[in-house]
Every structure is written in C-alpha cells, then in structure tokens.
C-alpha cells in the first residue's frame, strides 16, 4: 500500500523526534521534528524509490507536511491509488 511505503521512507529519512508509527496520516511532520534539510533528503529518497521527480509546483512545504499530503502527491505523479 502506498501509505505504508511512504511511512517507511519517512521513518528512514525524516529524522523525526516521534515514531512514525505513532503519527496519524494527517499529523504535521514538521511538528514531529522534520527539518527543511531532512525534508530535502526525504524528497530525494521518495523520488528514487518511486522513480519520479517532483515538479516545481510541488516543491512546497505543504507537499511534505504530512504522510497524507506526501501520499497524495506521489499518487498524482505515479497514478497509484492513495
């Protein structure tokens, strides 16, 4: 499932202060400790994992705000169901 895959990547690359398994899909990753530097690493890991490139219009804080927002963006780019 797409959400599970995104959660795994966030858990590995997000450097969160909270356990990703404890966060709701709509919880703010920034409030959970995601920094701007970690968000770039997270974006690169997602791009590599899914073979995609985020277009400039998606390079916004709100795209990486939560697991749900990342999942929606990846679903849009890959055609997979969120």
Where do the language-model regions lie?
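Phosphopantetheine-dependent thiolation modules in NRPS/PKS and related acyl-activating systems
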Residues: 1-35, 41-44, 48-82
